[in-house]
A protein has these predicted regions:
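N-terminus-centered regions that define maturation/targeting leaders and the start
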Residues: 1-141
Length: 141
């Protein structure tokens, strides 16, 4: 059993995400930490989405998508539902939403190019996930 976890120095599990991380505010990336990945981990991946958006926009809204091969100096980011590459903070149109940050420890390096989709990431991660963890936070306009 892995002790893999994901934490954020900017807010606690289940707590309110500070406004500066909101898309319509400063849109700063929160300080996410991947803790105690399995020793055979070669890549860490992150998906941040908003399942509460289903009621407002008819789908789970993707806010952040990235992977980091541990042999590389920086992560490679995918395209969000804002049609932008990189972090797109919370921006609920209809009240308080819960945001889920899902972390994955993988046993293979990935070769997706910047701007990849969530489906592309999920497809290449399949059969390579060593451990998973999640962090939730809430945000209201």
């Amino acid at each position: 059993m892995s002790d893999f976890s994901i934490t954020c120095s900017d807010f606690d599990e289940g707590a309110e995400i500070p406004k500066k991380f909101g898309y319509k505010f400063e849109n700063e990336e929160p300080n996410i930490s991947f803790n105690r990945p399995p020793s055979s981990t070669t890549t860490l991946a992150l998906i941040m989405d908003d399942p509460d958006a289903m009621g407002a926009v008819g789908k789970v809204w993707l806010h952040w998508l990235q992977y980091h091969n541990l042999t590389e100096s920086s992560p490679v980011e995918g395209k969000t539902d804002f049609d932008e590459i990189g972090y797109g903070g919370p921006a609920p149109p209809d009240g308080r939403h819960t945001y889920i940050f899902k972390a994955y420890a993988l046993d293979t390096e990935l070769e997706l190019k910047e701007g990849y989709s969530k489906q592309e990431l999920e497809d290449v991660m399949k059969d390579h996930i060593l451990a998973e963890a999640k962090l939730t936070g809430t945000f209201a306009p």
